[in-house]
Amino acid sequence: DEPFSAMDTYLREGLRLELSKVLADYDGVSVMVTHDRDEVFQLCKNIMLLDKGHVLIAGNSRKIFQDPVTCKAARLTGCKNISKIERIGEYRVRALDWDNLEFVTDRTVGDDITAIGIRAHDFEPLAGEEVKAKKEAGEENLIPVVDPSISEMPFEWYITLSNGLWWKKEKTIHTHDAAGVVPEYLRADPSAILLLKGEL
């Protein structure tokens, strides 16, 4: 139950690697309770997500991270960007919480889909000629970057847009100048759009 919660980062990461090796050699069943999505992804082949004592989803860890199915499960797996939607086509939605931006999906949007999600690392930055070329090619899912806020972490920039979308961009510990970090547009590939059910 929360085996690493009171440890500093260095010790926690080392012990997680050790536990991963122990579990790989263990032939029985083990149960781990955690709120840390990295622990789940690294240590568990299968997961069960609970909300107020009810099972939201259970199954293969990687499959659930790739397709969490419900809004609550998406949040628990770390998805920062979730918006209610209006279905406007078989493969097209309007994101009501993100200034009514329209998105094309790679899967059919069923009547039971209430929201979409986009993970903060799943955006492609675009600027200058790239933007022009994408627009001329009729590319979809282009998001203008308006009034961004930038926050620096040791190995990432957190960029939040005025419409509430989060983008996380990798950086090195030696980089502190935010100039050039923010592009004109972001693009979300249709395959990166999570189709979600249930309440936000």
Label each residue range with its predicted role.
Residues G28-V31, I82, E156:
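Secondary-structure boundary/capping residues
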Residues Q66-Y91, G117:
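C-terminal boundary and immediately downstream tail of ABC-type ATPase nucleotide-binding domains
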